[in-house]
């Protein structure tokens, strides 16, 4: 290269300063090419408010008609990431501070994305999930059984979710930059317990022996690192219910996972601010679009920085300190905000009320097999680590997830490689054929049937007991409630046999008035 430049210089008499400028430009281009080639993906983070109506709306989760919102514990958000190959496929994942995702919400979000981006984001590559908080506004789902307690569809809840999810994805799309993804896993032992341990013991010993615990205690974390800015986000998956806030709570809340997300985002921003205060000699890349020649103007920048007034009104005497503040301001103005999501996974019977279930009248442990107190389910409640303060329990369980996530985040070293891909399909669970092993050897093909809720369902759980005289584990039923059921829909013989030994309380899968009560065909991503 030097010989070529020397030759050009002899023939065209290029000034030495100009020659070195071109050399620097070539080196920068080569360096940029190397950086881009080392990045496997484009990554982008987004976050937007989805709080919705904060008063006079039934909350989604406990199916308690008396749980009406009357204020805000803390606001709810939709947090998104996009991962794309520069010239290939891309995927979107959205984590909601909501009880669950809604197909109706998803359809409307996809309509808006199509209007913006064409076929770039579709049902095939967009997945939306909820953290399963039981303290968010209800009325946004399309099946009757989920909106009975909210007395139907609530437009304000629906619109807040659609708007927030769309804007979160738009943010992530606009933040797409070359970057890398790291994965890490670890056990978190004190943030979830099995709330139905007697039911778990009904599983065959051979099945239970495959697992270390009676619930999943593994957290999996993805760390997103922007080539320019460094870490810009983390999403982790861990199983524990969003029921630290009780069924009598009336304040909108993201519960323990929403709290954990706020803790981690605050932690990162505080640490980032401290790092900027310590300062480095490296100037952010995008400053070059503001200042034509950074290095030639270095002294001028320092003089400018020293002329700034400090907070008490005195002249800043430490040039280096003021310069760092200028660099920090320039950096923060362009830097995407750090997004941390604490996502839900196989939380089934995993409760954050880790102290166990106790009778509220006597203080003794609830009946082990049926979670009752003197035969009544209404008196049996799980206790969180901050008992009797549910806000403290929310903070503690959130903090435990946050601490584990920070540990995994700081030690994440396994980098993800390979192609970006996705899978999506619609599965009709009301008539699904499944091959199962037979006792004594061999196998047989069985078929599912439309959904139905049993008597035990109405008993609720230790996180949120039901009403009346229902009991967990009830496989007999009750003549009175069968009579009430038949006023709505009497299940036929085929349906009863299919669900046996579970007695049917509500034949939701076959109830169609005024429209479907329960889903039959699920979309799986």
Descriptions of predicted regions:
Residues 20, 31-525:
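Non-catalytic substrate/cofactor recognition surfaces at enzyme active-site rims
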